[in-house]
Each structure stands twice: as structure tokens, then as C-alpha cells.
């Protein structure tokens, strides 16, 4: 328990803090992940203080040297956290004083933990977004390149988990890749708003020392400077935006995981997951559990929970800084870690799974060509609504006879519509079926190939911006 004299900010207090209160308030076990960016911010601020005449050149040199020593201790894992270290800021400042003496007390001149912590968090998020973007782009690339290799593989498409129309396996892969490109774009968009410097805003009223904020911006590599000091220290829009984008990304990853889980079941048998990403059963030795995909699916709920929690924290706060905002960092750290792990595992799953072409072909039952039968009649001049009814009658007739749709005789079909001719047999060919969909975005080979090329170009642009 810290005594009155041990408190870094304890000048106006009498007595000791309740140890339970100290435990509740302390965040050092969580926010020590900000150690390096906190030091970066302090180095930049020390230079600004020297320019403002608060630090002499000699004091600046000692301060920077001390901060470099602290950075080295953190990187080597030898920094010692003490019971009086409430958070990463007080820990670093306490250690700096041990190294360079009372000069360390000048470093916080004109600076508040309010603008310090939000600067640290933004620096952390900038770095993290770059890493997440790299992992996301690698996953998209893996999907796209696999689609290019397996472009001739055809399987049933599904709605309501029922067979609908034949599609290319590549069309399925690209459907997920395209969704993920939007997530990549959103990550780039929020990075622009994160890239605004809050340091120099003080507690809420601004900085009274004519601190050169342009110097701070340049030193910390921010794109611009916050316009209003009160808004700068209170805003956690960037946290909410990041968690929101993360939640949407996890929806897309969860959906992909669910599809692959279904396709990998013995009932479907469309693909086999690598043993690297599966586990066995503790009771049933024949089982191969898709744990990797199930964990991806479940982690989506974890991210949603973090977003919901921070929204509830923020919704009723008055202006500027409140201690409630301490909750933001744990949410960000957890979601950053979750995304990095999930994206890498998803990439591994996609790159190592094996498709079972025979099972995909076996699942291409003639009934999934009933819409093609309707299109056949449309090409013969029948309005689509009538053609749809006629095709449905053909399906019903085949079911009542206990045969497949393609085994109906020409007489059977003519009993439904005289427009059916001997060329109707061409309808019952899955390659012909998928090749009808040549419009941009369709499942014809030419369209799929065009999608692949467009996505490759998009990946190049996103990689340059990451």
C-alpha cells in the first residue's frame, strides 16, 4: 500500500489509499504494453520542452539518455515494476527520476496524463493497424491465389443450406475475399482519423508553455494536429471505430469459418482440413474436430463484447477525461491480439485445406439445374414467371415419378410446355450452366478470372497504403 509520501500525485491528500482502491485503480499490468510508445511520446515532449526553454540542452540530453535506458530495460524484460507504479506513465517517470534525479520532474511540465495516455494509445493503434492490415492482406491474397489455381472446380451453391445453382469453387473463395477487402478499406479509413496528434492539449484547456505542437507531430509521425484540446483528451471515437471495424471483420471471418466447417463435415465431404488446424476427440478416436474454425467463429463474440462494453462506458460520460476511460486500453489490446491470431490461423487453414472434387461433383444433382430449365424456356420466348412455373412442374413431375429431373422424357417435358425440344438435353450440363453467368461478378470462368485480376490490383494498392 502506498503511503502519502509515496504517492506521485499525493500532495493534497492526507492518509493512505485503501489497498482495494489501489488494486481497482491500478492498470500497470495491462497498460505496460504502452511502455515503448509512452517513452516515444516523452522523448518528443522533452524536445518540445527544450525548445520552449523549460529544459536546458544538458537537461534534455540527460532526459533522453534516461528514457533510452528505460526503453532498453523494457525491451530486455528487466524493468522492475514497483507496488507504487499505478500505471505505465508513473512507472516510467518513477524510473526516470531514479536514473537522472529531480530533472525528471520537469518532463511533465504542461503535460497531463489526459493527453499523454490518448497519445500513447493512438501510437499503439497506428502500429497495430499496420500489422493487422498486413495479416488481412495475406489472407485475401491466399484466397485469391487459391481461386486462380482451382478455377475449374464446380460445386453446388447453397441458400437456406439447400442446393440452388452450380458455382465455381473459386466464386465461393472470392466471395469471402471481396468482403475482406472492404474490411481492409475500413482499416485504412480509421487510420486516417487515428493519425491526429492529441499531445499538447494538456488536461483539457491546452498547453500554457507555447509548446511547438508541429514539432511534436513531426517527431511522432502524426499526419495532423487536434483542433480542440477538450475534444482531444476525451475522444475515444478511434477506439469505437476500431472495435466496430474489428467486429465487422470478425463477422466475415466467422461466416467463412462456418461455411468451411459445414463443407468439412462427413455429410458434405467437400474438403479436408489439415491436421495442423484440427484436434481429436477425447472419447471418439475417429473424429477430427475443426477447432481452428470453431475458435475463429467464437472469437467473433468476444470482439462484439468488447465493442458493447466500451460503448456502454462512453455513453454517459461528461466532457473531457474521466477514469472510466481506463477501460479502453484492455479492449483495444484484446481485440488487437484476437485479430492477429485469427487472421494468421485463417490464412493457414485456407492455404492447407484439400478439396474433394469427387464429392463436389457427386453433389451436383440435376435438380440444381431447374433454374436453367426455366432459362431455356425464356430463350424460347416464354415470360420468366411462366417459365418458372413450368420448371417447377417439371421438378414435381420428376419427384412424383421417382426419377431425377434430367431423366424426364421429352414427352414428359412437352406435356408441360410445347416449347421444350430435343436440345433441352444441353441444359443438364453443369459447365454449360456456370458459363451462362458471364456478366461482371458472375461465376463464368471469364468473370471469375476478371475478379481475380481486379482483386490482385486492389491488393497492390492496399499493400502500398498499409
UniProtKB/Swiss-Prot annotation:
Pathway: Amino-acid biosynthesis; L-arginine biosynthesis; L-arginine from L-ornithine and carbamoyl phosphate: step 3/3. GO terms for biological process: arginine biosynthetic process via ornithine; L-arginine biosynthetic process. Eye lens. GO terms for cellular component: cytosol. InterPro entries: Arg_succ_lyase_C, Argininosuccinate_lyase, Fumarase/histidase_N, Fumarate_lyase_CS, Fumarate_lyase_fam, Fumarate_lyase_N, L-Aspartase-like. Keywords: Amino-acid biosynthesis, Arginine biosynthesis, Eye lens protein, Lyase. The active site is at residues 160, 281. SUPFAM superfamilies: L-aspartase-like. Signal peptide: none annotated. PANTHER family: ARGININOSUCCINATE LYASE. Belongs to the lyase 1 family. Argininosuccinate lyase subfamily. This is Argininosuccinate lyase. It comes from Columba livia (Rock dove). The gene is ASL.
